[in-house]
Amino acid sequence: MPQRMGSFANPNDIFFDMSSFHWNVLAIIGARHVRKEDVKTKQDVIQYLSEWSEFERAVYLATFEIPCGKVCTYQRIAERIGRPKAMRAVANTLHNNPLYPIVPCWRVVKSDGGFGGEEKAAASRRKHVESEGVLIMNGKVVIRDDVLF
């Protein structure tokens, strides 16, 4: 039988499910929570990332908009979000993408068309971009105006 908080006679008798607690609190305060598997639109992304920093939200939203068959550079994303010198911060943010594969971080490349990071991860991103029809030569995206977003 669940115990009231403050009347715990035996710690083994405590029944407290944090996930239920989380949803109950959200219901009480009227907040809408979006589960990762329900994220499909730009508005869903905004809502899912509501507690993330403004910078992180901007990076993930800019990346979310990159269409299949196109790539964008870390530099261009940094410029798009108004932080032109923050290329490395963009890369670090995308490295921790909480909305993979909804936010297509594999479509973001270095300015020379290369894939940064560890070779195994870079090879996976390279393969993914190539499967979307992007031309790869010598392990890098061939940067052309018709491919850049």
Residue ranges and their predicted role:
Residues N24, I28-F149:
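Nucleic acid-binding interface residues in structured DNA/RNA-binding domains
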